[in-house]
Amino acid sequence: MTTIADRSDAYCVVGAGAGGLAAAKNLMEFGIDVDVIERAGDVGGNWNGDNPFSAAYDSIHLITSKPYIQYDDFPIPDDYPTYLGRSHAYQYLSSYARRFGLYEHAEFNRTVEWIERRDGSPEWIVTLDGGEKRRYGGVVIAHGHNWAPRCPSYPGTFNGVIMHSSEYRTPAPLRGKRVLLVGGGTSGCDIAVESAQNATATFLSIRRGCYYWPKYLFGMPTDVVYERVLKWRMPRPVVRTFGKLFLRLNSAGQPERYGLPKPGHKLLEEHFVINSTLLYELGHGRIAAKPDIAELRGDRVLFTDGSEAEVDVIVYATGYRMTEFPFIDRKHLNWTGRTPQLYLNAFHPVYDNLFVIGYFQTSTGNWPIMDYQAKIMSRYIHLLRVDLKRAIWFRRAKATPVTAAQLNGGIKYYDSERHWLQVEHITYRKSLRKLIRRMGVEPPAPAEVPGSHPAADLAVPAQSSSAVAAKA
């Protein structure tokens, strides 16, 4: 009979990316013990350059500027760039983990195989790699949703190399090749630009038109301008009019002038595509825009407009499957239709000890939003333990269907898998902050807010034995 280690006084946090770290930190502030299970060898998720499971390429940069990506109680150093690249993002997250003592609670190179709840018990049995089982008082799922590649299927066969953008790291495999990028999201645009600077020829196949935002408007980060405009509380049609005007004045105007498809939806009804150089490369002829693929023909590709191109490498920048939970039965996630039905995408309507952090898609500012989710979670768990009467209102709230106004402020995103989890970040952020205020409780011993990041904080501590072994 398999022995089950008793950790019923603790929470199991699955994942040590930005969401998992925020979850662990907030739980620990309320004296709730945690084990953070991470399948890679360090914290940081996709931003950890040594993570073999990362889907990020070496040149990747955040599309959110410093003021809107940092955790509220852990400012990004002033000497970091406006848009963090992979190394700075990793340094920031690892510094956060060190400052709040999260490394001591993390178990690296471990995998959660299965999570189950046995009949009659509110606790969770977590099975780890090697068959080890533990009983936890609660579980926080923070494994992210950009790790299960989605690849299209086309008629015909292709004789060259096919890869998904999740496999792409550097432009080395593209040098001297004729490259076709499929997909017009941020990653597809970034890789297309790198290809244009290294490959013999670069083609970009885009099925659906979209609006392309530069990283700067009027000399300021685009998200800073966007936030300021929305504070004017203008009607949505007026915001769209201003947005189109900003794009025409500050970037390159209409995408169709560069051979790209015309957007078939209104401005703001999509996940933002932010890239300052794609249209420049298109305008200089180093990238050729193409419509959707009609057929693969050996070393050539036929497009829906009847044109053909000789191609050596195809890179599918076609996103990820958004609803992958391979370690827990869907019945535990209140699954209905295409996705789990969780209050504000995080809180189970029935279970008081199962939470999902980071299960949303937003155009900007997702790290602090994960932190707000974690703040609500930790406060709720704390109130359940010390003041059940004050916790009841949130138990009732999370059992009710969330309204569109709480998620997207009335914006109707066009139907696409990438939008299944899409929220309008300002509206969603306000909804979370409102709940935090209503909780009316702060950690007994609030974490010290650092004014700077000493150099020692940026050094990654040596990884030691597992947290459970350390507790033994």
What are these regions (language model features)?
Residues 2-59, 75-216, 232-389, 413-472:
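Flavin (primarily FAD) cofactor-binding/catalytic cores of flavoenzymes
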Residues 61-65:
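Flexible "cap/lid" subdomain of the alpha/beta-hydrolase fold that forms the substrate-access gate
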Residues 68-69:
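Active-site segment of extracytoplasmic enzymes that catalyze sulfate/phosphate-ester chemistry
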Residues 206-210, 220-227:
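FAD-dependent flavoprotein oxygenase/oxidase catalytic domain
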Residues 387-404:
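The conserved 3'-phosphoadenosine-5'-phosphosulfate
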Residues 404-416:
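Glycine-rich phosphate/pyrophosphate-binding loop and the adjoining helix
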